[in-house]
């Protein structure tokens, strides 16, 4: 009798995705982040579901409902902090996953890569709306500032902003719809993840060498299931260390003050994982220009397959490109730091320089370096 996992219509899909999947034998720990992102999504959906049972999306009671969750609900504080810091873990894994894709040339799988970029946008939108829900000072002003950016769109901008707000300012209608979207989007993300995996399993996994690995593949289970479980344990450990020892480390103290439209916080800034994009936005004095730079700073990822000039896939054997990649990584750290600083000298000029460097490396220097490497190898 044939094994049920190979014949049953439903179990067969799971088998081909997680058990008998042919996997390159040399993939490193950088390939762990896909499964860790799946784990993060599950954690966020489960904790979010329990938070939604006690949360009220009304401007009068939203802040106190979060307080109620932390004080009166059994382990409510734990669920709330796992959800808040789980988002940070999600973005750490996300950025490392994207970085791995850039370094090893995984973007040559067009469909998988483009779905991935769409996923990144969707997750960013979800995280932004989630940050608004506790209705603290930074929630309110963050929502006001970021939604206001849409008013830079010519002709329809103002109408669009008022339509999103559901009125003439960020108020009850805005909070209610943000809660509705924040609830539904993770399920849309889960569906997109399925599509991401579908395209990914069409081509199979890339590997650190960038070479075709058909002759050297092993079954996913038990080799990589064990490896993924180790990654999951390390992720859970680091998340729980963060949650139980310093849950507010990555948050903003201003968000413990209830939202007040009459009192603007001295420094309005988003969560740490958006600071690099926020720094790029602020580095351009023109409003529309800033918004375009902000969108393009993420959308630029879709251009990588077009900008790939090298005859080798990854950067494993390309020292010049490796060097530029790490300069780009350092530049993103600089932008993240600048995004959290006040708009004054010398931070303005540092932010502008880092923003120009970011786009220049990706659009000009990396493709030129790739062509030079081809030349040096007489290809």
Curated annotation (Swiss-Prot):
It holds the Pfam family Cytochrome_B. The chain crosses the membrane at residues 33-53, 77-98, 113-133, 178-198, 226-246, 288-308, 320-340, 347-367. Binds 2 heme b groups non-covalently. It is a multi-pass membrane protein. Heme b b562 binds at residues 83, 182. GO terms for cellular component: mitochondrial inner membrane; respiratory chain complex III. Heme 1 (or BL or b562) is low-potential and absorbs at about 562 nm, and heme 2 (or BH or b566) is high-potential and absorbs at about 566 nm. This is Cytochrome b. It comes from Petaurista hainana (Hainan giant flying squirrel).
């Amino acid at each position: 009798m044939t094994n049920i996992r190979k014949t049953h219509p439903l179990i067969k899909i799971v088998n081909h995705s997680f058990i008998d999947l042919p996997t390159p034998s040399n993939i490193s720990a950088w390939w762990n982040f896909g499964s860790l992102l799946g784990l993060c999504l599950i954690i966020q959906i489960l904790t979010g579901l329990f938070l939604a049972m006690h949360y009220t999306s009304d401007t009068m009671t939203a802040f106190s409902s979060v307080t109620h969750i932390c004080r009166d609900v059994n382990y409510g504080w734990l669920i709330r902090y796992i959800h808040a810091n789980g988002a940070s873990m999600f973005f750490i894994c996300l950025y490392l996953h994207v970085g791995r894709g850039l370094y090893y040339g995984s973007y040559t799988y067009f469909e998988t890569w483009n779905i991935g970029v769409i996923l990144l946008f969707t997750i960013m939108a979800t995280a932004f709306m989630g940050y608004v829900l506790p209705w603290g000072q930074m929630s309110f002003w963050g929502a006001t500032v970021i939604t206001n950016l849409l008013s830079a769109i010519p002709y329809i901008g103002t109408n669009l902003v008022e339509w999103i707000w559901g009125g003439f300012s960020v108020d009850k209608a805005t909070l209610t719809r943000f809660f509705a979207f924040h609830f539904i989007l993770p399920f849309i993300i889960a569906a997109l993840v399925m599509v991401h995996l579908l395209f990914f399993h069409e081509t199979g996994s890339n590997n650190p060498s960038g070479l075709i690995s058909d002759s050297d593949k092993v079954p996913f289970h038990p080799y990589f299931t064990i490896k993924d479980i180790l990654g999951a344990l390390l992720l859970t450990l680091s998340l729980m260390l963060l949650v139980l020892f310093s849950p507010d480390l990555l948050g903003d103290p201003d968000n413990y003050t209830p939202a007040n439209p009459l009192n603007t916080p001295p420094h309005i800034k988003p969560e740490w994982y958006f600071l690099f994009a926020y720094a790029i936005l602020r580095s351009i004095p023109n409003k529309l220009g800033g918004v375009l730079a902000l969108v393009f700073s993420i959308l630029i990822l879709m251009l990588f397959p077009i900008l790939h000039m090298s005859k080798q896939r990854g950067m494993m054997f390309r020292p010049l490109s490796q060097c530029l990649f790490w300069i780009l990584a350092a530049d993103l750290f600089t932008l993240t730091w600048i995004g959290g600083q006040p708009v004054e000298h010398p931070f303005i000029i540092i932010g502008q320089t880092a923003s120009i460097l970011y786009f220049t490396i990706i659009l000009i220097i990396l493709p030129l370096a790739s062509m030079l490497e081809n030349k040096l190898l007489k290809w």
